[in-house]
Amino acid sequence: MAPRHTDRLVLRRWRIEDREPFAVINADPEVMRFIGAGAVLGRGLSDDLVVRFEREWEARGFGLWALSARGDVDERLLGFCGLTVPMFLPSVLPAVEVGWRLAREAWGLGYATEAARAAVAFGFSECGIEEILSIVDPQNERSLRVCAKLGMTDRPDRTHPATRKRVRVLGVRLHS
């Protein structure tokens, strides 16, 4: 699949050279604070995620894109955004989730919203998905603001089976 472009971003498939900067992102406690149990990931687990992301593209025709700034000749990894099946929360299945994770230096620039809008549009227009969810820690105000900008509304809250913490489930429908 060819890369996609927004006004400021390139949404592309993962490359081997993305693994090192992705491991740095996943080792940042602030980045990981609201993800699962909030634990940082070591290099091996981080690399495993990249493999899983690519397999999801092959199996489903959608997945999580690597993000780079448009015009950055090095295509330095800023993080990821895209669509995935939230297997970690079986109570919402069958479902598709839009998710994102950005390096801290990319926070506050509107990149998550810009990339998530592109991912949701892709899901609706090219994948035939009718509803897209986002599963968010209730204390993650930044991600909740992104969800609001996407027009997402609350669905019933759930309990994360691994952490036993409440998570907010928000969604947007194709024709809403």
Question: What residues fall within each predicted segment?
Answer:
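A short helix-loop-beta-strand connector motif used in the catalytic cores of GNAT acetyltransferases and
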Residues: 53-66
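Acyl-donor (CoA/ACP) binding surface of acyl/acetyltransferases
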Residues: 1-34, 51, 66-176
